[in-house]
C-alpha cells in the first residue's frame, strides 16, 4: 500500500537503565491499560514496515506480546543514551528511514510518520525531523535518514551525546502537534507514573458525571 512516503522502519528506544523506575522496564509497564509495547505497536504498525526494540533485556517477553518483533542491543556496552541506540539501529534495519520513539511516551499523534516525513522534505539538507507536543521538543521521538549515521558516529566518538546539539548538525526539522490536557508527554519515574494514573482516573470519573 502506498502511504505517500518512503519505506520506514520503527525502532522503540528502551535501552536505558530505568534508575528512576527502580529498574522496572518501562516498555512492559501499563500506562493506559495496555503495556507500552502493545500500545506503540498497535498505534504504528500500519504506518511502518518492520518494528524493532533497542533493548538489552526481556527479548522473550517482547516476543510473547508481539511475536514478529525484532530486537537489538547498543553497539557498545554501557548506557550512552538514545544517540547510541539510534547509531546502533543502522546496523540492523533495512529501511533508509527510521522512526524512533521512546518507550515511555504517553501520546502518539495521529499521522505522526507522514507528518515527520513532510517536515523532513521542507529542507533538502535535513537528515532528521522531531516531534514537538504543546511546545515541548521530544528529540528522541524523531525520524532519521540513513545518511545521519556519519554525524551520529562523530558525536559519539567525541562523547557529545546531546540529541539537541546533534540535531542542529543534521539540520533537523520539527513536526508540531497540540494535545489538550496532556499533563505528561512521557513518564520518567514511578512517581510520575502514579501521578499520571491518578489524573487519568480522575478525568474518567469526571467525564462520566
Curated annotation (Swiss-Prot):
InterPro entries: MobA-like_NTP_Trfase, Molybde_CF_guanTrfase, Nucleotide-diphossugar_trans. SUPFAM superfamilies: Nucleotide-diphospho-sugar transferases (SSF53448). One of its GO terms (molecular function) is molybdenum cofactor guanylyltransferase activity. It is an enzyme of class 2 (transferase). Its EC number is 2.7.7.77. GO terms for biological process: bis(molybdopterin guanine dinucleotide)molybdenum biosynthetic process. GO terms for cellular component: cytoplasm. Mg(2+) binds at residue 104. Its cofactor is Mg(2+). The keyword Transferase applies. Keywords: Cytoplasm, GTP-binding, Magnesium, Metal-binding, Molybdenum cofactor biosynthesis, Nucleotide-binding, Transferase. GTP binds at residues 13-15, 26, 54, 74, 104. It catalyses: Mo-molybdopterin + GTP + H(+) = Mo-molybdopterin guanine dinucleotide + diphosphate. It comes from the Bacteria. Gene3D superfamilies: Spore Coat Polysaccharide Biosynthesis Protein SpsA, Chain A (3.90.550.10). Pfam families: NTP_transf_3. Its main location: cytoplasm. It is found in: Cytoplasm. Belongs to the MobA family. The N-terminal domain determines nucleotide recognition and specific binding, while the C-terminal domain determines the specific binding to the target protein. Transfers a GMP moiety from GTP to Mo-molybdopterin (Mo-MPT) cofactor (Moco or molybdenum cofactor) to form Mo-molybdopterin guanine dinucleotide (Mo-MGD) cofactor. Monomer. This is Molybdenum cofactor guanylyltransferase.
Amino acid at each position: 500500500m502506498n502511504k505517500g512516503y518512503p519505506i520506514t522502519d520503527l525502532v522503540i528506544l528502551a535501552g536505558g537503565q530505568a534508575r528512576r523506575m527502580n529498574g522496572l522496564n518501562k516498555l512492559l509497564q501499563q500506562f493506559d491499560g495496555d503495556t507500552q509495547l502493545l500500545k506503540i505497536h498497535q498505534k504504528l504498525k500500519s504506518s511502518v514496515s518492520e518494528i524493532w526494540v533497542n533493548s538489552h533485556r526481556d527479548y522473550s517477553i517482547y516476543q510473547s506480546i508481539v511475536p514478529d518483533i525484532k530486537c537489538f542491543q547498543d553497539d557498545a556496552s554501557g548506557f550512552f543514551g538514545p544517540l547510541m541506540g539510534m547509531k546502533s539501529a543502522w546496523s540492523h534495519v533495512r529501511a533508509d528511514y527510521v522512526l524512533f520513539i521512546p518507550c515511555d511516551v504517553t501520546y502518539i499523534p495521529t499521522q505522526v510518520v507522514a507528518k515527520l516525513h513532510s517536515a523532513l522534505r521542507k529542507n533538502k539538507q535535513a537528515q532528521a525531523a522531531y516531534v514537538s507536543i504543546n511546545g515541548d521538543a521530544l528529540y528522541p521521538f524523531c525520524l532519521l535518514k540513513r545518511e545521519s549515521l556519519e554525524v551520529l558516529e562523530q558525536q559519539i566518538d567525541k562523547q557529545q551525546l546531546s540529541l539537541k546539539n546533534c540535531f542542529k548538525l543534521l539540520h533537523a526539522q520539527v513536526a508540531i502537534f497540540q494535545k489538550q490536557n496532556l499533563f505528561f508527554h512521557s513518564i520518567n519515574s514511578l512517581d510520575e507514573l502514579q501521578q499520571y494514573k491518578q489524573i487519568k482516573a480522575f478525568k474518567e470519573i469526571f467525564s462520566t458525571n
